[in-house]
Structures are given as structure tokens and as C-alpha cells.
Amino acid sequence: MALRATYREAAGVTVVDIGGRITLGEGSALLRKTIRELLEDQRTLILLNLADVDYIDSSGIGELVSAYTGVKNRGGSLKLLHLTRKVHDLLQLTKLFTVFEVYSDETTALRSFQ
């Protein structure tokens, strides 16, 4: 399934709803493009909703780290929401839970930006 990404505003935070596979090629490129567009629009508080991401490879993990770094370098914050079991396990295996703030509830995640 191809990656799809849409975004919406909630409580001053840009919530990016992502679905599909974040993999080498189109998937990681779309994520990179979406984050770049948000940063160009001065949107630096970003919550990535990964509830519908069914697969992520090492390239996808690299894009998440790159997105995090890019947002942080702009003085912003990027957090993760609704990890699937596969994505959760991969972040745990790669020890990226020490980098990302991860939430299972959108309301709590949005409050964390304040």
C-alpha cells in the first residue's frame, strides 16, 4: 500500500495522519516532502499519527529521525502518536524511544506541546 499523508490543525499543533508503508522510495520521499512543506509554512509543532502505518523499513526510520532533527533545528517539536505494534517494536529495537516522545492518546499528545 502506497504511503498517504494528510494534515490538520488541532490546538495549535499540526497533526499529520500517515497511512501505508514508509519504505525506501516513494514512501520515505512523501514523508520528507510533507515535513519540508510544513517547515516552509513555519509549522514547527508536529504530531505524526502513525496509526495506519502497517510497515516501516530502515529508510523510513531514517526519515523519521531526519524529520525529528529538521523540526528540532527550527526550534520546534515532533512527537509520535498511535504506533502500531510493528512500528513500536522497531523503535524499541533501535532504541529510538529515547529520542521520540510517543503517545497513545491524541488529547494527551496535544497537551504535551504546551
Language-model region placement:
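Short acidic-hydrophobic, aromatic-tinged amphipathic segments that line or gate anion-handling sites
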Residues: 101-105
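Amphipathic alpha-helical interaction surfaces in cytosolic regulatory modules
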Residues: 22-100
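Short, charged, intrinsically disordered terminal tails
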Residues: 109-114
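Acidic phosphotransfer microenvironment of two-component signaling modules
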Residues: 85, 107-108
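STAS-typified acidic loop motif
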Residues: 4-33
